């Protein structure tokens, strides 16, 4: 345990030594035990989950109890937030004020899709993982069609996937993948450390397991 703690201290001290970190006090927001802070945008706006409602500060919220619990919220583009409800295979796109722009109900598609995760692609596209055939696909949520010839097969059970627009990073229990805009795998590395989560720091990748944090340079 002491060795793991030392690793984290050295890791973060290395970041602090090369990057000026400034902490600013934010305005107080009234919360209770049911609030879960899930994100903060570049303007300092805070996003919470409260009793399965998505809230932005104290003024804006989105809720649709008919879709069950919120599985994931993708904040990469704050003007097109993606709210994923896996139980009902439904994606809801929200604007900056949490008003609904559109929604996708994959259960109503002509083919059978078992979407278990989503991540932003570009302006009107998202990446989805279809468990029915273990493939990464790209979907145009405005025209509600899949992009032809983008169906990337991955090996292992999906753990996490995140995009920084330029690339999609996919983590399974076997491998870490880096996938380009066209769905081509350009990087594949064994998941030997048992990573459970992908994060971004500037242009680099952070990987974490249950006790350690790793820094992967994105060259």
Give the ranges of each region predicted by the language model:
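Beta-strand-rich domains and repeat architectures in extracellular enzymes and scaffolds
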Residues: 26-51
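Short loop/turn segments that connect beta-strands within beta-propeller blades
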Residues: 58, 95-99, 140-143, 180-184, ...
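Bacterial Sec-dependent N-terminal signal peptides
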Residues: 1-26
């Amino acid at each position: 345990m002491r060795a793991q703690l030392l690793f984290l201290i050295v890791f973060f001290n290395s970041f602090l030594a090369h990057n000026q970190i400034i902490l600013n006090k934010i305005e107080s927001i009234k919360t209770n035990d049911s609030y879960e802070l899930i994100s903060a945008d570049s303007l300092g706006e805070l996003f919470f989950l409260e009793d399965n409602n998505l809230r932005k500060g104290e003024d804006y919220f989105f809720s649709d109890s008919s879709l069950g619990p919120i599985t994931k919220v993708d904040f990469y583009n704050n003007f097109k937030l993606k709210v994923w409800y896996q139980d009902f295979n439904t994606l809801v796109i929200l604007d900056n004020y949490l008003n609904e722009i559109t929604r996708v109900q994959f259960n109503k598609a002509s083919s059978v899709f078992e979407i278990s995760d989503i991540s932003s692609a570009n302006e009107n596209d998202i990446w989805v993982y279809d468990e029915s055939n273990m493939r990464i696909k790209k979907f145009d949520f405005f025209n509600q069609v899949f992009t032809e010839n983008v169906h990337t097969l991955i090996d292992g059970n999906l753990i996490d996937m995140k995009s920084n627009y330029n690339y999609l990073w996919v983590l399974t229990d076997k491998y870490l993948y880096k996938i380009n805009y066209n769905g081509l795998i350009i990087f594949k590395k064994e998941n030997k450390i048992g990573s459970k989560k992908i994060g971004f720091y500037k242009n680099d990748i952070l990987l974490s397991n249950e006790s350690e944090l790793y820094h992967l340079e994105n060259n």
